[in-house]
Design a protein with these regions (language model features):
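Conserved alpha/beta catalytic core and glycan-binding cleft of carbohydrate-active enzymes
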Residues: 1-82, 86, 118-174, 178-189, ...
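C-terminal beta-strand-rich structural cap/linker in extracellular carbohydrate-active enzymes
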Residues: 198-240
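Aromatic- and carboxylate-lined catalytic core of secreted/periplasmic carbohydrate-active enzymes
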Residues: 98-133, 230
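A generic secondary-structure boundary signal that marks alpha-helix termini
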Residues: 115-118, 122, 191, 226, ...
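Active-site rim elements
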Residues: 45-57, 94-104, 215-220
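Acidic/aromatic-lined carbohydrate-recognition and catalytic surfaces
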Residues: 159, 171, 226, 281-283
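Intrinsically disordered, polybasic Lys/Arg-rich low-complexity tracts
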Residues: 237-283
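C-terminal accessory region downstream of the catalytic core in glycan-modifying enzymes
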Residues: 93, 98-107, 113-115, 173-207
């Protein structure tokens, strides 16, 4: 999927989503092994279509998607700094590439992504059960965007949104599980990694009157071309339940009952004084 020209990805959207549906049938390892970067298969970097900027962005997107996917990870040496030629067992890796700023940025990205993965249990603690994963959106094939949630054993979660096209998505809305404020905590498009630096910041407020994807509220994001963002809820808003409105019929009925009760009560307690008889004259 990731090696396809972006124009054809919408016709192969199931290639990027299907693995999630059987990810919990066994305990899987997700390998990009030496077999994938040898014998004419190209390095991961050169599997990517487009110019050099798009190749670097695609590698960052792929590795971020891989880290967010359920299952344990395996990457062959050289992937972390975007080795350009195939692996050759007769020679060492092209460490000289690290003198190129773009490859050095790629190495820093791989390092930071690994640390981010280890520091956030939702990405690895429940890897082999549906309890650790939930879809938000998997069917937006026309824009080649997917979004899902990952959970740890305590119920803490991260939201992951992947944009697989070299197209900027402004105000791209997805369902949000809780009302409140969300924040972007990691982006493959950060400037320090060679990206554009587009960020959603730390104040992403929910649209509580815009339900989406089976959730009562939504958030809108700006997605850089060929990028992955990790989002979390930093402040939940407690919804106050409004008291149930009483119908006019019920209110009128209650008023009638009260009036009838008062009338009945008054009729039962009213007393009549006996009339005094006039004294008759004595003979």
């Amino acid at each position: 999927y990731i090696s396809l020209d972006p124009i054809y990805r919408k016709f192969n959207h199931d290639n990027i989503t299907f693995s999630f549906f059987y990810a919990f049938s066994e305990n899987f390892v997700l390998p990009i092994s030496h077999d994938e970067v040898v014998h004419g298969k190209c390095s991961l970097f050169n599997k990517m279509p487009g110019d050099r900027d798009q190749k670097f962005a695609s590698v960052r997107t792929f590795l971020s998607y891989m880290m967010a996917h359920p299952g344990k990870k395996l990457n062959f040496m050289g992937t972390e700094f975007a080795q350009e030629i195939e692996w050759n067992y007769e020679q060492e890796l092209d460490w000289c590439l690290l003198s190129d700023e773009r490859h050095a940025q790629m190495q820093r990205f791989s390092k930071d992504l690994n640390h981010f993965y280890l520091e956030h249990a939702p990405l690895w603690e429940v890897d082999f059960s549906w309890e650790g994963f939930s879809w938000i959106s998997n069917d937006d094939y026309t824009q080649s965007v997917i979004a899902f949630r990952r959970f740890d054993k305590e119920g803490n979660e991260l939201m992951v949104v992947c944009n697989f096209l070299p197209v900027l998505r402004e105000k791209y809305c997805i369902g949000a599980p809780y009302p409140g404020v969300y924040e972007e905590i990691f982006s493959s498009d950060a400037v320090i990694y060679g990206g554009s630096g587009l960020s959603n910041g730390a104040e992403i407020k929910t649209q509580d009157d815009e339900p989406m994807h089976g959730m009562e509220q939504s958030i809108c994001l700006n997605l850089a071309p060929l990028s992955v963002v990790f989002i979390r809820c930093k402040q939940k808003k407690v919804r106050r339940k409004k008291p149930a409105a009483k119908s006019k019929t019920a209110a009128a009925s209650k008023t009638k009952k009260t009036a009838a009760s008062k009338t009945s009560s008054g009729a039962g307690t009213k007393t009549t004084r006996p009339r005094k008889k006039k004294a008759e004259p004595q003979a």
